[in-house]
């Protein structure tokens, strides 16, 4: 249960510490004070100030500490987030903005708390498709759909699927989007993936790098039942119980009975 949570924490930590709190201010991130001002304006959602700074020649592609760019700050805009992103990307800002540890803007955009589908739509108009992958780094096997599932962002999940995300992509270690969706208590995501037609027979641990002969490859349902099935007791959280009913009903429509309980 903890593996995906830890991965998501790692994915978000540098963003949160650099742009979500008071520990690191923009003048410490960007050596160019103009860029620091632009980052502040982006985070504030001040469209007029952003336009003024861009027209004044502020370098929107400037890379700061750990690979930070103004695009990262735009994702944290307190208002007007889609418009902020659009202004910056139209001016030439980097929609990918890889950090030094491999984290990136597209994954953060779909996995952050309360991710905004409208922001994701803007990224899509600037080259970030529903099946985009990082060009390198430790997260280059993580799909956009899987990242959205990790963030528990059902509206974004639906958007990605509607735009053509590969439901049946398999991470060579962690498995399918359904593996991710069943790693927690939000079964509404799993229900949606089942209703959308995800292949229920996809396995995890398929990477040739896994040399342990004892490794057991499991479907998402098999893995859930092995590690978590029946362990939530007779009185689960109401939202978990309701999501479970929706999930098992979605399976039933496909002629599948869940082999274990909640």
What are these regions, as identified by a protein language model?
Residues 60-63, 95-98, 130-136, 167-170, ...:
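Ankyrin repeat boundary signal
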């Amino acid at each position: 249960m903890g593996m995906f949570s830890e991965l998501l924490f790692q994915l978000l930590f540098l963003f949160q510490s650099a742009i979500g709190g008071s520990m690191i201010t923009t003048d410490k991130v960007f050596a160019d004070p103009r860029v620091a001002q632009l980052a502040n304006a982006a985070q504030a959602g001040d469209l007029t100030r952003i336009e003024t700074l861009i027209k004044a020649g502020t370098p929107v592609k400037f890379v700061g500490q750990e690979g930070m760019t103004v695009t990262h700050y735009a994702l944290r805009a307190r208002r007007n987030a889609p418009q902020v992103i659009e202004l910056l990307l139209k001016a030439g800002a980097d929609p990918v903005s890889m950090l030094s540890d491999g984290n990136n803007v597209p994954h953060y955009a779909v996995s952050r708390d309360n991710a905004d589908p409208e922001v994701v739509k803007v990224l899509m108009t600037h080259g970030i498709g529903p099946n985009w992958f990082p060009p390198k780094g430790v997260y280059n096997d993580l799909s956009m759909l899987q990242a959205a599932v990790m963030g528990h962002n059902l509206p974004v999940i639906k958007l990605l699927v509607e735009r053509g995300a590969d439901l049946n992509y398999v991470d060579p270690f962690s498995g399918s989007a359904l593996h991710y969706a069943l790693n927690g208590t939000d079964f509404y995501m799993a229900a949606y993936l089942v209703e959308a037609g995800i292949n229920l027979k996809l396995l995890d641990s398929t990477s040739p790098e896994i040399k342990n002969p004892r490794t057991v490859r499991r479907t998402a349902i098999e893995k859930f039942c092995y590690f978590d099935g029946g362990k939530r007791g007779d009185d689960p959280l109401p939202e978990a119980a309701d999501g479970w009913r929706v999930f098992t009903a979605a399976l039933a429509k496909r002629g599948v009975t869940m082999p274990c309980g909640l």
